Amino acid sequence: MNLLSLMDLCFSYKDMPLMKEVTLNLKRGELIGILGSNGAGKTTLFDLICNIKKPSSGHIFNSAKRQIYLTQILTPPPLLRMSETGDLIRNLDSSTAPTQSEMLIRLERWSPSLYKRYSLISQKKVARCSYGEIRSYFTLTLLLLESDLIILDEPTAGVDAEFRHYIWLAINSARQEGASVLVSSHYTEEIAANCDRFYMLANQRLEAFDSGGEIMSRYNASSLDEAFIKASSHED
């Protein structure tokens, strides 16, 4: 059963079309990736799903009871500790959000190593954290909020290779516990390796793929990066 469906979605900035007849389905417990170059419209697509922007035409069917959205722009107050920013996020939905203790127990169950890194970052002030630390902390905090629809806009951007591994571990753990996840990335290999299916957003269209092998075959490419480049520049 689909948790989220987009049907023939179109969007334009004034008279400039950005998306044409976009269709996407996300089932419960499914992990779907969105690939696309800068400016292709990945963030706009997520904004449409979250009702931040309105489509020019088409339909969005969203049956999620609780959804969260990690945006690209994160500006936590620099004098707060990261744990305090986590409390602010959690308290935005205080009636149903898990307690901090419950979140930490869940994270330790996912990965003791990830729990340790998260705990270390939580004690630092925002001003002393790198961009990657801030982004990874926000991503993990949102994943721990027990939402049924999780939308992550480039969660691994600016994050080191080790923490990228742990973020994907957490994403997969949340999915295995019932969450449906939409995630965008510039890293073609990590999308192909971790997602059940993925889409390529290019030239105003959303193209579906079941595997990395399929996109390579369709674009006669010898690598995922080559396939990404060819798909980005391909025109109907």
Language model region names:
Residues 35-37:
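The feature captures the beta-strand-to-loop junction immediately N-terminal to the Walker
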Residues 50-91:
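ABC ATPase nucleotide-binding domain signature region
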Residues 150-154:
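Catalytic Walker B motif of ABC-type/P-loop ATPase nucleotide-binding domains
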Residues 161-163:
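Helix N-cap at the start of a conserved alpha-helix in ABC-type nucleotide-binding domains
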Residues 184-186:
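H-loop/switch region of ABC-family ATPase nucleotide-binding domains
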Residues 191-193:
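A short, surface-exposed alpha-helical micro-motif characterized by mixed small hydrophobic
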